[in-house]
């Protein structure tokens, strides 16, 4: 399991999300509060869209297999960038020499020229049985851009393939439909191959102007009794959000200030503060969509029936 974080709203220094809170994303790499037996030590990645930067439609990109808590470059960058949108990820892998820890496997995934990025918390069990069947559903120009070994990068290519223009800027509804269509394809391939093992697919997908997130799992709770690591996956597919005016210090802690209409939203595997008040748990089998408009943040939660 990994930990994911997405933000959309008022300009906000990255350090407030990665470092400053008492359960920040960097802390979740080595001391996650909702993971008892698993750490996220296989690298960090982020995409950050800053409207004040040169070429604001192109996000700042950073990823490294070093631990983010020891990464001075990341710390300095986080203090300088104040994006209106951020997608970040700390990667967790099984403690095995079969795990491939490499920069090409770090999230968020972003093919050159594409406007959409994707980060994933979860794991498609028995993915090797599905991988080559996915080629039929992924556009050739996208399949040949896959560089890593993860199921997540294939999910990214599959989502892009459902868009009318995988290199264009999708409307929020089109992006949400593409994510749902990708999940339906994955379900069909699993059914065809008799795969019925618990496989979480929590996603954060963004173009920098909108955001789609899912809390979803195929065959939740079904796992081989001899697989102790798989059993520990079950509590880790959490997803939380805080929505309001802007995120900042208030008294002795950090909170999202209330505002109507809202202007900012944070979505994360775990609340960024030990005090969960002000945070809501994303319902299971649901999708969140958010979009920045002139009137504020349009935000919606909907059932995800695929």
Where are these regions (language model features)?
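N-terminal segments that mediate ammonia production and transfer
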Residues: 1-306
